[in-house]
Amino acid sequence: MADDQERDLQRFLENVDEITSLIQEMNSDDPFIQQKAVLDSEKKLLLMEREQEEDGCRTTLNKTMISPPQTPENADEMSPDAFLASVEKDAKERAKRRRENRVLADALKEKGNEAFVRGDYETAIFFYSEGLGKLKDMKVLYTNRAQAFIKLGDYQKALVDCDWALKCDENCTKAYFHMGKAHVALKNYSKAKECYQKIEEINPKLKAQVKEHLNQVTLREKADLQEKEAQESLDSGKNTAVTTKNLLETLSKPGQTPLFYAGGIEILTEMMADCTERTLFRTYGGFSTISDHEVIRRCLFLTGKDAVEEVLCVSVLKLWQEVCVDNEENQRLLVTHPDMARLLPSFMTSRILVIQQQSLDLLLQLTQTENGRNQVIKHLDMTQLCEALLSFLAFSDKKANTAIGILTDLALEERFQVWFQTNLPDVLPALTGALNREPKITSPSALCQCIALLGNISAEPTARKHMIAHEEFGNACLDLLVKCEEDMDLFREITYTLLGLIMNLCLEITFLSEMWVVKMSRKCLSLLNSKDGGILTRAAGVLSRTLSSSQTIVEEALTAGVVKKMIKFLRMGGQTASRYAIKILAICTNSCHAAREEVVRLDKKFDLLMLLLASEDEILAGNAALCLGNCMEVPSAAPSLLKTDIVRVLLKLAGSDSKETGVQLNAGIALGKLCTAEPRFAAQLRELHGIQVLNSTMKHLNDS
């Protein structure tokens, strides 16, 4: 009892010290210290309640008084119990108010968000501020308000709000993000980089986004230096710099003829010899002078252009190329101009060849860097752009290669891949049109590159399903394969690449129409007569994925001598070809006795299959076990293996910890068929304790 009283006393004294400290913090002038004290007091209250519940399990001192308590001599004095009760009551009231304020703050935040979306940033700031009046430690209100301040150009206030958000949560990545943007706007580039680097430290998963923002900071810093040097050249009276400025002023004059502007733009283009003039073009509003000029703009958007309007358009395209040379900030400004999203794709599909060529040259220049490619993907109409690039397959010259090369480079960017997965159904008609091109009048290398791009895209399951769902796409693949077979020497690369795409499509065999599968299988059976090793391998690859869907095709394949050809594949070696060959043999022997007999005849002592069973490639070994098990149904097959260690080999596979459960299952089935066909193998199995191994394997397979 005395020990319990002593512990209670010590606990009480500790509580008094802690509560006194909390009260002092609650009275602090710093609102964050106040809020922290409130939270700590709530935690303390919960802890005390938990301790009281635990204390209820042990004997406590009976505090019942015989006589009523005496009035304290000093009214200001408070008993310890009353003091704790007061703190408890205050904490509960504060917790209740905090919950109520949280609801109000959330409602005000939503109103602020709605105003922000409308572009009414002042109103958004008002609601965020009102919310902070209800709850001062709500970090999202600080970061949202900082974002609104950035939109209004009030970067210092944005930085202050970001600081407050970090006081609420030192790992608030959103605060560092907005702080970085504010520092960039204030030209504090080193501080901006520190902010973005801090984001990656906190969350390494954001590495890609951080890299992009750091790149933007570097480019902005480089652009500032260019502008400073360009202004110094202008101030020093450099002739070309002054001429550039004067020409821009002349071109901004309204009401002149298109030919006047075309001539001025051509002279201006000649001035764009180095970085100084290109930068001055930017700083003195060159992009808006050209793109927003009433006469020039009208000519750019006209569908049917006369000779003068054509000259003006070409001169503008050449100017844009020159001002973008080695100047990524100019490239950014050009690509982000609102008109460019639809203007550049429309130029590329123009009936005027010179405009087509110049616009293609411009796009090529814009996509030379990673940043340029991402700017194009982010800001241009990618559906129209893809269609425009694919339309260049109509040309047999280098324009087709350039266009598909650009598309391929864009497709390597993660941003493009994300866009493509979402928008593939919209682009599929154009991609199907590319496959429908007549290979004899299309650039073979460009068409091949286009098909390779489709093959890469089809490696992703969702993309494959979209392609298969678009029936015309599969038919276009089949038709193109037929066209290429007419001149295999000329179209060898196209055929080889196309078979790779078809192999990917056949991974979704259940979604393909039976008629298409039959036609494609027949075409690949004929390709097995090719002398080209690459085409042979891929044709076998397609068949390894289609044969199992149709007994008719299996029978046609046997008639075409597929077993003999696959045995030849296996004798030649090569992991990829062997994988396809043994799978085809497994499919054929699984459904056709004639195939089993032919395998037994061509591989009399099963030397090939034994070799594959010993392979470290689990897929090879598993299909070899399946094929061997099928062949055990041929009467003379099992005895031919008596002088081999086939039981030990199969038992090892059946008891292995293979990731491919089919390996264990196929080996177990093969053992069963082997022992059934030849009882002497059953004796070997018992000697090797194989029954226990098989039982254990079957139990494991059933459990998994």
Swiss-Prot record:
Main location: cytoplasm
Modified residues (Phosphothreonine): T71
Cited InterPro entries: ARM-like, ARM-type_fold, TPR-like_helical_dom_sf, TPR_2, TPR_rpt, TTC12
UniProt entry keywords in alphabetical sequence: Cilium biogenesis/degradation, Cytoplasm, Phosphoprotein, Repeat, TPR repeat
The keyword Magnesium appears for this protein: no
Transmembrane spans: none
TPR repeats: 105-138, 139-172, 173-206
Subcellular location: Cytoplasm
SUPFAM superfamilies, alphabetized: ARM repeat (SSF48371), TPR-like (SSF48452)
Biological process annotations from GO: axonemal dynein complex assembly; sperm axoneme assembly
Entry GO terms, CC: centrosome; cytoplasm; cytosol; nuclear membrane; plasma membrane
Keyword Phosphoprotein: yes
UniProt xrefs under Pfam families: TPR_1 (PF00515), TPR_2 (PF07719)
SMART domains (UniProt xref): TPR
Biological role stated in the UniProt entry: Cytoplasmic protein that plays a role in the proper assembly of dynein arm complexes in motile cilia in both respiratory cells and sperm flagella.
Cross-referenced PANTHER family: TETRATRICOPEPTIDE REPEAT PROTEIN 12 (PTHR46540:SF1)
Name of the protein: Tetratricopeptide repeat protein 12
Native organism taxonomy: Eukaryota, Metazoa, Chordata, Craniata, Vertebrata
Gene: Ttc12
